[in-house]
UniProtKB/Swiss-Prot annotation:
The lineage of its organism: Eukaryota, Metazoa, Cnidaria, Anthozoa, Hexacorallia. This is Ragulator complex protein LAMTOR5 homolog. InterPro entries: LAMTOR5 (IPR024135). One of its GO terms (biological process) is positive regulation of TORC1 signaling. Keywords: Cytoplasm, Lysosome.
Amino acid sequence: MEKDLESHVDDVMSEHGVVGVMCTDDQGLSLIAKGTANPATAGFVQNLAESARKLYPDSEQQPVICLESDACNLLIKSQNKVTIAVHKVPS
């Protein structure tokens, strides 16, 4: 599984504008972090995803969180017990 996850993260990192990717487990532990993604923030990222799910408890789809700043956009989504955070340069 680790090789598959690393391959998927490498694919995301190769997308235009992506400067960092991190995946966490459902306990908030960093599974992998590349580029500008800081593994020390894994717990915060997972907590944001969990809080977003609580805002929409009846939704069948997992919400996507988008945090924007002048320096970076951060997209967060959970699926299948893995939370992914993608750092992108603003377009």
